[in-house]
Amino acid sequence: MRIKIFMAIAAAFMCCDLAFSQAKLVEKVEKKGDELIIPYSKYILPNGLTVVVHEDHSDPIVYVDMTYHVGSAREEIGKSGFAHFFEHMMFEGSDHVKKGEHFKVVTDAGGTLNGSTNTDRTNYFETVPSNQLEKMIWLEADRMGYLLDAVTQEKFENQRSTVKNERGQNYDNRPYGLVSEFTSKNLYPYGHPYSWLTIGYVEDLNRVNANDLKNFFLRWYGPNNATLTIAGDVKTADVVKLAEKYFNSILINSNITLTK
């Protein structure tokens, strides 16, 4: 059933793609001789998504990374921890991927996945056999373009509890766990976005509601504030076609005016 849904959505994305122009090559780095450099090609899609491809055919695997150029430094006083909290919500399912299905699709394909957040970026990544690349790109496109309607209060409360437990385990209840928090608080002036930890303060996590997180997504998430990086046993032309196929139908986020 899941494969049928995947194929149906793939067909819909492909039809939408026909109305859009192609990705533009903006940078190409090639290795010369014994030069210590990683060759890659960089493209920009019409909606602003950056796509970086590195070919490495040494093993039949591929690494897929979607980086959004937003982290805890874009939070406000009283709203700390939003970027990291939303990282958790991105694994809770989207319009076409039920809760738990994202993990299942990746692991059933023989892959691994995770995400991370720091002050200036949030990224989501998978490593899978290279013949599973299209599924991974589809998953990333679906949660970029079709996530918010799938955010429920139940999922929100579940992840609020998870994030609070994570803070307790890694900071509050660990010997010297608060050293980094006190260091940041004293290193930067009050109100500076680097003065609080990415995990956020417990009082802010208690205060946040689902609409706050949705507004954070609407403000900072979108193709024109993201970079898709693909590295492994792939052909650059094939990757670009897949990126166009699944991402071209996702509109530019007009709230984003950053220059990357």
Predicted regions and their residues:
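Intrinsic structural disorder/low-complexity segments
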Residues: M7, E87, R143-Y146
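His/Glu-rich zincin catalytic helix
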Residues: S21-F103, F125-V128, W138-A141, K214-K260
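Acidic/histidine-enriched segments that form metal/cofactor-coordinating
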Residues: A23-K28, S94-D95, E101-F216, T257-T259
